[in-house]
Design a protein with these regions (language model features):
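C-terminal catalytic/motor cores of large multi-domain enzyme assemblies
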Residues: 6-181
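Short, well-ordered junction/capping motifs at the entry into regular secondary structure
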Residues: 1-2
Length: 181
């Protein structure tokens, strides 16, 4: 779950939320929900962040992520998590998200599959970052690697579209300067 646990993880998770919002703008076919009548496409990226609370889980929403800076996203997440923990979230603060993120990485979990939060059609599972040796310009270097998994409702999002989302997400998260474009 996305929770405030340290300054480093706070920076990391707000970047993930921002990158997901930017990615949804570039791959709007993933910013959808399935209904019995049709697939509903959303214009704004309203990201639900999973928060563990006593007795379960709740998913407060950071709305219009694509329009906000990382510091604004961070302050909203902090406020929403606090309200979730205190049981003071208003219904409109946890209903109506268009996409979810679940982060078990903060518990050291490297890889997992998250369950879609209906009526949304996708959820991004974020695993723990780990330092591993990689090859860069024919040299072995230590890199921070994070596993993410995208679960999609295939009635609304085809596998190829989900793969496109992950490609764009990877490109942006690995090139942070793209967040400001």
């Amino acid at each position: 779950t996305l929770l405030a646990s340290s300054a480093a993880s706070d920076v990391y998770k707000r970047q993930i939320v921002k990158v997901a919002g930017l990615t949804l703008n570039k791959v709007p076919e993933c910013n959808v929900s399935w209904t019995n009548e049709s697939t509903k496409l959303f214009k704004s990226s309203d990201i639900s962040v999973a928060v563990a609370i006593d007795g379960g889980l709740i998913t407060p929403i950071v709305r219009n992520v694509e329009e906000k800076g990382i510091h604004k996203i961070s302050s909203e997440i902090k406020e929403l998590v606090e309200k979730a923990k205190n049981g003071t979230l208003l219904q409109n603060e946890y209903n109506g998200g268009t996409f979810s993120i679940s982060n078990l990485g903060m518990y050291g979990i490297k890889n997992f599959t998250a369950i879609i939060n209906p009526p949304q059609s996708a959820i991004l599972a974020v695993g723990a970052g780990q330092k591993i040796p990689t090859v860069n310009d024919d040299k072995i270097v230590i890199s921070n690697i994070m596993n993410v998994t995208l679960s999609c409702d295939h009635r609304a999002i085809d596998g190829a579209v989900g793969a496109k989302f992950l490609q764009v997400f990877k490109k942006i998260i690995e090139n942070p300067m793209l967040m400001s474009l």
